[in-house]
Amino acid sequence: MRIAVIGAGKWGSALHLALKENHNCFISSLHQRDLEDFVSIKEALECEYLVFALSSQGMRAWLKENFINKGQKILIASKGIEDQSCQFLDEIFLDFVPKENFCVLSGPSFAAEVMQKLPTALMISGINQELCKKFASFFPDFIKTYIDNDVRGAEICGAYKNVLAIASGISDGLKLGNNARAALISRGLIEMHRFGKFFGAKEETFLGLSGAGDLFLTATSVLSRNYRVGLKLAQNQKLDSILVELNEVAEGVKTAYAIEKLAKMKGIYTPIVNEVVAIFKGKSVQEATQSLLKQND
């Protein structure tokens, strides 16, 4: 049995380190990297189990260009919604593999702490519960895994919390205090729940690892790149320059645009996301904050 992680960024590298503890695990990306266990894309696709840790915005293009379905079992470890199509990642993968052959990984997990082998808990979601159990068995003892079948809930929580982390970073960057941040996060959880319920996500997902757990982590720590984007926006830095300086993918940026478009199409009330997008488009953080404070629900 062989496992390959597709994507050699921080999260992909952390997953590779964890999975190789007890299994024959490789890592691959489009560009040659000087990494232990690195293999070509062609070699990686020969593995029976694939873990995808690519940018959500580049996932479809990568699959179109490189993927050959050989019955591989897939774990989607990326978090985001494709901006151009407003599709969730599981919808994108359905164009390439049957739904019985993939699961979604979610939960509160900073790559840096996984690399340090610090205790972590993750959720694996899929309609094929036996496959979920199989992927769960691959992880080492310092990672506790749970399984469920709420793929859509896991996808939405994993994507939405990144946008809320940007908003939380803005709040902290403006030095609005712990009370304000707590209010923002709790209202954000309600907003995420409202959005997710429209698409069929399950109630319990929002209060579990995929929802509240990942949101609380991502929205309160400078280890979160999305939170750091918010901090810099609060300093009146331009988004483009922030992303260049970051030199990493902040999934919450493109996902915010996708959620805003979906919410408008479906008539879902998403005030926090709307204000984050307005800030991206030039609205002052102070004005956006005042707009949120005036919201009644």
Curated annotation (Swiss-Prot):
Enzyme Commission number(s) from the entry: 1.1.1.94
Residues the record lists as binding sn-glycerol 3-phosphate: 79, 107, 109, 161, 214, 224-226
Enzyme class: oxidoreductase
UniProt: NADPH binding residues: 11, 33, 79, 111, 225, 249, 251
Listed InterPro entries: 6-PGluconate_DH-like_C_sf (IPR008927), 6PGD_dom2 (IPR013328), G3P_DH_NAD-dep (IPR006168), G3P_DH_NAD-dep_C (IPR006109), G3P_DH_NAD-dep_N (IPR011128), NAD(P)-bd_dom_sf (IPR036291)
Gene3D superfamilies (UniProt xref): N-(1-d-carboxylethyl)-l-norvaline Dehydrogenase, domain 2 (1.10.1040.10), NAD(P)-binding Rossmann-like Domain (3.40.50.720)
Active site annotation, chain numbering: 161
GO BP of this protein: carbohydrate metabolic process; glycerol-3-phosphate biosynthetic process; glycerol-3-phosphate catabolic process; glycerophospholipid metabolic process; phospholipid biosynthetic process
MF terms in GO: glycerol-3-phosphate dehydrogenase [NAD(P)+] activity; NAD binding
Pathway it works in: Membrane lipid metabolism; glycerophospholipid metabolism
Transmembrane intervals: none
GO cellular component: cytosol
Entry keyword set: Cytoplasm, Lipid biosynthesis, Lipid metabolism, NAD, NADP, Nucleotide-binding, Oxidoreductase, Phospholipid biosynthesis, Phospholipid metabolism
Catalyzed reactions: sn-glycerol 3-phosphate + NAD(+) = dihydroxyacetone phosphate + NADH + H(+); sn-glycerol 3-phosphate + NADP(+) = dihydroxyacetone phosphate + NADPH + H(+)
Cell cycle found in the keyword field: no
Primary location recorded for the protein, binned into one broad class: cytoplasm
HAMAP family listed in its UniProt record: NAD_Glyc3P_dehydrog
Family annotation (PANTHER family): GLYCEROL-3-PHOSPHATE DEHYDROGENASE (PTHR11728), GLYCEROL-3-PHOSPHATE DEHYDROGENASE [NAD(+)] 2, CHLOROPLASTIC (PTHR11728:SF1)
Family: Belongs to the NAD-dependent glycerol-3-phosphate dehydrogenase family.
Function: Catalyzes the reduction of the glycolytic intermediate dihydroxyacetone phosphate (DHAP) to sn-glycerol 3-phosphate (G3P), the key precursor for phospholipid synthesis.
Protein's recorded name: Glycerol-3-phosphate dehydrogenase [NAD(P)+]
Organism: Campylobacter jejuni subsp. jejuni serotype O:6 (strain 81116 / NCTC 11828)
